[in-house]
């Protein structure tokens, strides 16, 4: 979420005015995100913002600090659609118990929660509230319909990981959709508008190279935090893409293709100055191993690997082990 938007909200509250967050600021409340949801709509965001007072300023200030410190943190939103049900809801017969009362009150709420499960908000909350507030860190929501009368959602306060799809191949078409859906920022690069267009790649950044080949790729720069997937059509420009990704020092680089083809790519990239260490950094073949063959199946294998790389990047070994124990996967 944009820091300037949060600072503007703080200023509005200090002046006694109603702050404004739009659905562009909090996409979970957008028309597309709430379509078919009887309990949430763009108007729900307006209701929450109208309920805020000066007492909510510390919550927003904590969000600003989280952005400055690059924490894994979220602003969360409690949406109440039936106040009586919200405060009187009960645990179900399957999951663990979360106290003897429902939500602490029947009013909407803005709150802060980070990955360390620190919660900041303007009012007391119940144990059942805390359970659902912590779950927004798996966001934008998780188990949000477990208790009646209310629902929950959130917006991340950290930047998403950027994934470069080099090549507008059929696999890239499927991967762009999946990667966007699981929270990556996607950029697709190709040299042919017949393949790289809005119809095939809506809702992602598209960069059409200015040359007939991929030589203009050198005009672009990836961040060391970015992930690069080499998926060029017919593998024609895989060597150039591998060299570019390694020269950019991308965090993750993966290339599609069989061992025979990759051997040829190795000879070409070596001649271009790539070291053996850089070559070994490239995941070959890209994606998790589970028998994927079709473009859609390959995209699932790739995005699963990207999720795993992101997970390992964000959480240390102790945190990952604790998570696995909690799931019963020793």
Q: Model segments located where?
A:
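A short acidic, amphipathic alpha-helical/loop segment
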Residues: 175-178, 240-245
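Adenosine-phosphate binding glycine-rich loop
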Residues: 256-330
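ADP-ribose/adenylate-binding Rossmann-like module
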Residues: 189, 227, 232-235, 243-268
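Cytosolic regulatory regions of ion transport systems
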Residues: 200-203, 236-237, 243
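Conserved SAM-binding strand-loop segment of SAM-dependent methyltransferases
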Residues: 205-211
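Segments forming oxygen-rich coordination pockets for charged ligands
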Residues: 1-190, 198-204, 223-227, 309-330
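Short amphipathic alpha-helix with an adjacent loop that forms part of the alpha/beta core around
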Residues: 213-224
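Short alpha-helix immediately C-terminal to the canonical SAM-binding loop
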Residues: 194-198, 262
């Amino acid at each position: 979420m944009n820091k300037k938007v949060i600072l503007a909200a703080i200023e509005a509250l200090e002046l006694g005015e109603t702050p404004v967050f739009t659905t562009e600021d909090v996409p979970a409340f957008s028309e597309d995100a709430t379509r078919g949801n009887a309990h949430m709509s763009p108007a729900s965001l307006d209701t929450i913002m109208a309920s805020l007072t000066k007492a909510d300023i510390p919550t927003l200030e904590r969000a600003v600090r989280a952005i400055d410190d690059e924490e894994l943190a979220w602003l969360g939103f409690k949406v109440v659609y039936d106040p009586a049900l919200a405060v009187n809801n009960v645990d179900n017969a399957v999951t663990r118990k979360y106290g003897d009362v429902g939500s602490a009150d029947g009013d909407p709420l803005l709150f802060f929660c980070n990955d360390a499960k620190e919660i900041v908000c303007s009012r007391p909350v119940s144990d059942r509230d805390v359970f659902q507030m912590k779950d927004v860190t798996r966001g934008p929501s998780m188990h949000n319909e477990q208790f009646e009368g209310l629902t929950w959602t959130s917006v991340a306060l950290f930047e998403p990981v950027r994934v470069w799809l080099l090549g507008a191949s059929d696999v890239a078409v499927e991967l762009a959709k999946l990667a966007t859906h699981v929270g990556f920022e996607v950029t697709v690069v190709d040299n042919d508008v017949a393949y790289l267009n809005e119809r095939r790649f809506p809702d992602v950044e598209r960069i059409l190279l200015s040359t007939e080949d991929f030589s203009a790729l050198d005009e672009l720069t990836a961040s060391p935090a970015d992930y690069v997937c080499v998926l060029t059509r017919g593998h024609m420009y895989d060597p150039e893409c591998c060299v570019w990704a390694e020269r950019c020092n991308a965090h993750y680089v993966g290339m599609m293709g069989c061992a025979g083809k990759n051997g040829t790519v190795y000879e070409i990239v070596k001649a271009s100055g790539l070291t053996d260490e850089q070559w070994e950094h490239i995941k070959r073949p890209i994606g998790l191993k589970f028998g994927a063959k079709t473009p859609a199946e390959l995209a699932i294998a790739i995005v699963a690997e990207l999720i795993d790389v992101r997970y390992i990047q964000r959480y240390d070994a102790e945190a990952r082990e604790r998570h696995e124990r909690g799931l019963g996967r020793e």
